[in-house]
Amino acid sequence: MIKYAIIFAVISLIAGALGFSGVAAGAAGIAKVLFGLFLILAVIFIVLAALGVGAAKKMMK
C-alpha cells in the first residue's frame, strides 16, 4: 500500500509542477476532449447493456 502512496505522491508532484507552468493550458484542453470522449463511450455502453446487446446478453442467458 505504501508503494501506491509513493507513486501517487510522485504523480501529484509532477502534476503540480506542470500546473504552475505553461503546459497546463494544453493539458487542460486534452483532458476536456478525453473526458467528453469517455463520457460518450460510457453512455453508449450503458445503453447497450440496458438493451441486452453483446456480452451482457450472453451473461443473462
From Swiss-Prot:
Keyword field: Cell membrane, Membrane, Transmembrane, Transmembrane helix
Listed Pfam families: DUF1328
Keyword Membrane carried by entry: yes
Compartment(s) where it occurs, according to its Swiss-Prot or TrEMBL record: Cell membrane
Membrane topology of this protein: Multi-pass membrane protein
GO cellular component annotations of the record: plasma membrane
Keyword Transmembrane recorded: yes
Residues passing through the membrane, by range: 5-25, 33-53
Entry-linked HAMAP family: UPF0391 (MF_01361)
Similarity field: Belongs to the UPF0391 family.
Protein name: UPF0391 membrane protein Pnap_0032
Originating species: Polaromonas naphthalenivorans (strain CJ2)
